Amino acid sequence: MTSNNFGDANHQLDAIGLRCPEPVMMVRLSIRNMQLGETLAISADDHSTTRDIPSFCRFMGHTLIASDVDSKPYRYLIRKDQS
C-alpha cells in the first residue's frame, strides 16, 4: 500500500530514533488529540512499526490509509475513525 498523500495529512509525527514501544505510544497520544476524520502522517525507522502500526489501527478501529515500508524512514498515513 503506497501513496503520495503523506504531506497532505492534518498532523505529522516524527518517530525517527524512537524504539518499541515508543512509536506506537506516540501515535496513540497524537490520535487522542485529533478530531474524527483527521489524518496523521508518521515517519519512523524502527522495523517493529511495520507490524505494530497496522495492528494498532485494526485494534483501535482506525484506518491505515497508506504505508511505505520499502525503505527507511517508514511512512504511514492513518485516519482517526473511532473516538
UniProtKB/Swiss-Prot annotation:
Location(s) in or outside the cell: Cytoplasm
InterPro entries xrefs: Sulphur_carrier_TusA, TusA-like, TusA-like_sf
SUPFAM superfamilies, A to Z: SirA-like
Gene Ontology BP annotations: tRNA wobble position uridine thiolation
Keywords assigned by UniProt, alphabetized: Cytoplasm
One cellular component (GO) term of this entry: cytoplasm
Annotated active site: 20 (cysteine persulfide intermediate)
PROSITE patterns the record matches: UPF0033 (PS01148)
Keyword Zinc among record annotations: no
Gene Ontology terms for molecular function: sulfur carrier activity
HAMAP family (UniProt xref): Thiourid_synth_A
Entries under NCBIfam families matching the protein: PRK00299.1
Similarity annotation: Belongs to the sulfur carrier protein TusA family.
Described function: Sulfur carrier protein which probably makes part of a sulfur-relay system.
Classification via PANTHER family: SULFUR CARRIER PROTEIN TUSA, SULFUR CARRIER PROTEIN YEDF-RELATED
Name the record gives this protein: Sulfur carrier protein TusA
Organism: Pseudoalteromonas atlantica (strain T6c / ATCC BAA-1087)
Source organism phylogeny: Bacteria, Pseudomonadati, Pseudomonadota, Gammaproteobacteria, Alteromonadales
Gene that encodes it: tusA
